[in-house]
């Protein structure tokens, strides 16, 4: 039987330029960003609607994709399209300041929120895994995670190596849509990196897009290349074809200790995202259909081997961190009782940024013209003149990051700056500096938009790790504020049962009405992050709330 989610004939690319295909830019924007998610330059497996992260899809099947496109082209500016796990289920009359699209992906009642139940529904065509930005139509390729990874690695260097990364190297696994950002982020931060992946096409793609510098013939070759780079002080990234569990265990056996150890394989999804040791990709694909339970068991056993190796490398002196793929949880379930002895990256390195509402602010040029991004880069520098670290990031991004699909930029800024930047971009559209509108969004991995006890909300100081009211409040506030589209997802990053999170996108179309919406949404959205962390007792967040005039009734002076 033909899989309705796969079509070899499809090649999707977002329209460029200033000509509308829909009735306004408020509906043209989600149309273009949906299509951009499936651009072959952007998506991991576009012919199967898979954007990134195992099976993170943009639409449930091709019939649903076609219908979403059809509806967006006819949608009026006082109507809202509802999308249920990648399927367009209704159009309702709302008003001009309401979102044009509301999306709910992969949400299950908690008792049933596990991969087994999800996979049953997925097989029946009743659900879709939206990951974070796959099903919410704001994925911009690996750049979307580069700066966050860069910030993490810079923080690692500060905490462990007195700020000096040169002559140090990082071991990691996974070069998919998220993991593929690691080699570039590492070399930008001054580290060398050895990145292991079992899929040769992923290594080739990262080499082609300049995220990865070189490919090694084997582990001996890779280690020799790293030793040479350490001597010369060069920061290089090396891809190695292999199974991460095998390579990590072999390094332990050899007594070779990297300076830093992490992992970004798709361990969150043991059925579709992680290749068991000793298996070929072809055998795994066959077994997923024949005996999915055996695949899950074998994958989790291999993850346990990898985590045991990570713990051994930590014991030998490596700075070891979980990069948010839930591999520790999978190993724990396989009997590795001390799997959580190494920390997640958010509590270890990122949380102080979240306390000030700083997170992965991103925008894309609907014109398709890179010059629009370069002009907005300059505007960011103009409006935030006293942040050399941010300026350095923008300079490196322009020099070293290849655009995938529509030109876009990621730039970590917080409560103080997001609305100012959004209003400035809207003014640039209004006065013709930009050739077409821009969309502003973010990852769901942000300060106020996610509950994920094994990642973003791990080890909250008040113990509120699993409280998921916060992303629900964030989504509702963004709807009330007039965002262009808002999404509520479950299971992104760490898999079914382990996270709830929300996304937001707003269009800068140059109108005065957009000014009002932008001012509300881009203050409120990061404001909920400051609120969430202030409520948990973080002094940085409480001070930020006071400095920025947030009205938090329970916050004591």
Curated annotation (Swiss-Prot):
Transmembrane segments: none
Pathways per UniProt: Amino-acid degradation; L-histidine degradation into L-glutamate; N-formimidoyl-L-glutamate from L-histidine: step 2/3
Keyword Ribosomal protein: no
Highest taxon, organism lineage: Bacteria
Reaction it catalyzes: 4-imidazolone-5-propanoate = trans-urocanate + H2O
List of residues binding NAD(+): 53-54, 131, 177-179, 197, 202, 243-244, 264-268, 274-275, 323, 493
Active site: 411
Gene Ontology biological process: L-histidine catabolic process to glutamate and formamide; L-histidine catabolic process to glutamate and formate
SUPFAM superfamilies assigned to the protein according to its UniProt record, in alphabetical order: Urocanase
Co-factor note (free text): Binds 1 NAD(+) per subunit.
Enzyme class: lyase
Keywords from the named record: Cytoplasm, Histidine metabolism, Lyase, NAD
Subcellular locations according to the entry: Cytoplasm
Cofactor(s) listed in the protein's UniProt record: NAD(+)
Primary localisation category: cytoplasm
A GO term for molecular function: urocanate hydratase activity
Matching InterPro entries: Urocanase, Urocanase-like, Urocanase_C, Urocanase_central_sf, Urocanase_CS, Urocanase_N, Urocanase_Rossmann-like, Urocanase_sf
Enzyme Commission identifier(s): 4.2.1.49
Family to which the UniProt record says this protein belongs: Belongs to the urocanase family.
HAMAP family linked to this entry: HutU (MF_00577)
Job description of the protein: Catalyzes the conversion of urocanate to 4-imidazolone-5-propionate.
Protein name in the entry: Urocanate hydratase
The organism's taxonomic lineage, starting at the top: Bacteria, Pseudomonadati, Pseudomonadota, Gammaproteobacteria, Oceanospirillales
């Amino acid at each position: 039987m033909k899989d309705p989610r796969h079509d070899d004939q499809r090649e999707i690319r977002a329209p460029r330029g200033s000509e509308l295909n829909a009735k306004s830019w408020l509906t043209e924007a989600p149309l273009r960003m949906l299509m951009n998610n499936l651009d072959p330059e952007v998506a991991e497996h576009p012919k199967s609607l898979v954007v990134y992260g195992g099976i993170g899809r943009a639409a449930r099947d091709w019939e649903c994709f076609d219908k979403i496109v059809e509806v967006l082209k006819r949608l009026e500016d006082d109507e809202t399209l509802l999308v249920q796990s990648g399927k367009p289920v209704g159009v309702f009359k709302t008003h001009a300041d309401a979102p044009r699209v509301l999306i709910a992906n992969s949400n299950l009642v908690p008792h049933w929120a596990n991969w087994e139940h999800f996979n049953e529904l997925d097989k029946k065509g009743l659900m879709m895994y939206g990951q974070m930005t796959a099903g919410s139509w704001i994925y911009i390729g690996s750049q979307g995670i580069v700066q966050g990874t860069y910030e993490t690695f810079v923080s690692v260097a500060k905490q462990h190596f007195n700020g000096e990364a040169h002559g140090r190297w990082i071991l990691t696994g996974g070069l998919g849509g998220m993991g593929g950002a690691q080699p570039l982020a590492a070399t930008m931060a001054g580290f060398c990196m050895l990145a292991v992946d079992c899929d040769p096409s992923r290594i080739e793609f990262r080499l082609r897009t300049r995220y990865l510098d070189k490919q090694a013939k084997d582990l001996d070759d890779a280690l020799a290349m790293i030793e040479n780079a350490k001597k010369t002080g060069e920061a290089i990234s090396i891809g190695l074809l292999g199974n991460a569990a095998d390579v990590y265990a072999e390094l332990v056996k050899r007594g070779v200790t990297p300076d830093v150890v992490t992992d970004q394989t798709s361990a969150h999804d043991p059925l579709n995202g992680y290749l068991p040791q000793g298996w070929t990709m072809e055998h795994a694909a066959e077994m997923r259909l024949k005996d999915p339970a055996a695949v899950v068991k074998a994958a989790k056993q291999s993850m346990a081997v990898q985590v045991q190796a990570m713990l051994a490398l930590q014991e030998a002196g490596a700075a070891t961190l979980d990069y948010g793929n839930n591999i520790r949880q999978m190993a724990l379930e396989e009997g590795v009782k001390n799997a959580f002895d190494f920390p997640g990256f958010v509590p270890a390195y990122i949380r102080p940024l979240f306390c000030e509402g700083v997170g992965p602010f991103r925008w894309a040029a609907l014109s398709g013209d890179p010059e629009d991004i370069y002009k907005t880069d300059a505007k960011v520098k103009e409006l935030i003149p006293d942040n050399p670290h941010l300026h350095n990031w923008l300079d490196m991004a322009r020099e070293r990051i290849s655009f995938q699909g529509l030109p876009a930029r990621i730039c970590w800024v917080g409560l103080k700056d997001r609305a100012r930047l959004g209003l400035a971009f809207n003014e640039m559209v209004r006065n013709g500096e930009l050739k077409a509108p821009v969309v502003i969004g973010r990852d769901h991995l942000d300060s106020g938009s996610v509950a994920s006890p094994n990642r973003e909300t791990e080890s909250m100081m008040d113990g509120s790790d699993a409280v998921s009211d916060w992303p629900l409040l964030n989504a509702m506030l963004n709807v009330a504020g007039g965002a262009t589209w808002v999404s509520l997802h479950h299971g992104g990053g760490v898999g079914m049962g382990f996270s709830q999170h929300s996304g937001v996108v707003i269009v800068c179309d140059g109108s005065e009405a957009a000014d009002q919406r932008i001012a509300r949404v881009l203050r409120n959205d990061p404001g909920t992050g400051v609120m969430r962390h202030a409520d948990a007792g973080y002094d940085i967040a409480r001070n930020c709330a006071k400095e920025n005039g947030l009205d938090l009734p329970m916050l004591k002076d």
